[in-house]
Amino acid sequence: MTNDALIAALAHLVSEGRNPDTMDIDLLPSLDIVQRLNQQDKLVPLAVEKVLPEIALAVDKITDAFKVGGRLVYMGAGTSGRLGVLDASECPPTFGVSDKMVVGLIAGGPEAILKAKEGAEDSPVLGEQDLKDIKFTNLDVVVGIAASGRTPYVIGGLEYANEIGATTIALSCNPDSPIADIADVAISPVVGPEALTGSTRLKSGTAQKLVLNMLTTASMIRLGKSYQNLMVDVKATNNKLVARAARIVMQATDCSKEQATEVLKQTDYEVKLAILMILTDLDIESARAHLHHQDGFLRKAVESHQPK
């Protein structure tokens, strides 16, 4: 695309428009500046609320993929790519899953997480190649993230995923975007022009983060990774998480700190297993087998077994 064509294309994007509510932001003192930013930020959850049906549909497709061994792959450039990498990296400690289950790809590779890599987003071929490099298959789901909805790197990835029959999801902050047109599910929270014109790391980035939170959290809940609203598959990999594991067991069972700690040590800090043992009086092997029989759903395991 020529420079003139690109300028014309950007002129039609909501996310590139000038915000009439912040035209004088350069004249304001600090408190007034952050108040204006805060006023704009308040619009974000309202925009996300309007696309909850699409988010729920995406959750169902992601959950279905997980159940057959598929992966969730995020791909984006710049802020969009970094947000995908961030959400993917939080899944193993939060939900006790493999770091291969949710993958974040950013245009330009890992180096682009810390420092912008100029031109990386302009290649659709690079998007396709990055998916090929991780052996992306039709069992997987790809979420293309682009505030503008027109990033070539993301378009290339989505088109390749479509070619091999994988599920494609587009996350953009502009209506009727190019990536929305080629995806199975289009999630488009329109947050309006940014407080600082074109700086889509602001409202657009916040909206994307909220949506990504929902996609992984809701999908993991659907897989039985929570009991009530407790993170029962959390991995106790540091002192804070060891303490959190004990608190979760105490909250789920009303047991003492001493009992929670003792049983957690028996289970090698498998929180879900410790809770089931305390609530049902099962020994560790019986509890493990019963939990497996209920496909890892702790609530089902508890409700289907009465204490001795």
From Swiss-Prot:
Task: Return the PROSITE patterns for the record.
Answer: GCKR, SIS
| Start and end residues of each SIS domain | 62-225
Question: Which terms are listed as keywords in the entry?
Answer: Carbohydrate metabolism, Lyase
Which pathway does this polypeptide act in? Amino-sugar metabolism; 1,6-anhydro-N-acetylmuramate degradation; Amino-sugar metabolism; N-acetylmuramate degradation; Cell wall biogenesis; peptidoglycan recycling
Q: Does the keyword Ion transport apply?
A: no
Under Pfam families, the record lists:
GKRP-like_C, GKRP_SIS_N
**Catalytic reaction list:** N-acetyl-D-muramate 6-phosphate + H2O = N-acetyl-D-glucosamine 6-phosphate + (R)-lactate
Q: Which InterPro entries match?
A: Etherase_MurQ, Glucokinase_regulatory_CS, MURQ/GCKR, SIS_dom, SIS_dom_sf
Q: Output one GO MF annotation.
A: ether hydrolase activity
Is the keyword Protein biosynthesis in the record?
A: no
Gene3D superfamilies xref list: 1.10.8.1080, Glucose-6-phosphate isomerase like protein, domain 1
Per the UniProt entry, the Enzyme Commission number(s) are: 4.2.1.126
Active site: residue positions: 90, 121
Q: Which GO terms describe its biological process?
A: 1,6-anhydro-N-acetyl-beta-muramic acid catabolic process; amino sugar catabolic process; N-acetylmuramic acid catabolic process; peptidoglycan turnover
Subunit annotation: Homodimer.
Which family is annotated? Belongs to the GCKR-like family. MurNAc-6-P etherase subfamily.
Q: Which HAMAP family match?
A: MurQ
Additional detail: A lyase-type mechanism (elimination/hydration) is suggested for the cleavage of the lactyl ether bond of MurNAc 6-phosphate, with the formation of an alpha,beta-unsaturated aldehyde intermediate with (E)-stereochemistry, followed by the syn addition of water to give product.
Provide the function of this protein.
Answer: Specifically catalyzes the cleavage of the D-lactyl ether substituent of MurNAc 6-phosphate, producing GlcNAc 6-phosphate and D-lactate. Together with AnmK, is also required for the utilization of anhydro-N-acetylmuramic acid (anhMurNAc) either imported from the medium or derived from its own cell wall murein, and thus plays a role in cell wall recycling.
Protein known as = N-acetylmuramic acid 6-phosphate etherase
**Native species of this protein?**
Vibrio campbellii (strain ATCC BAA-1116)
Q: Gene name on record?
A: murQ
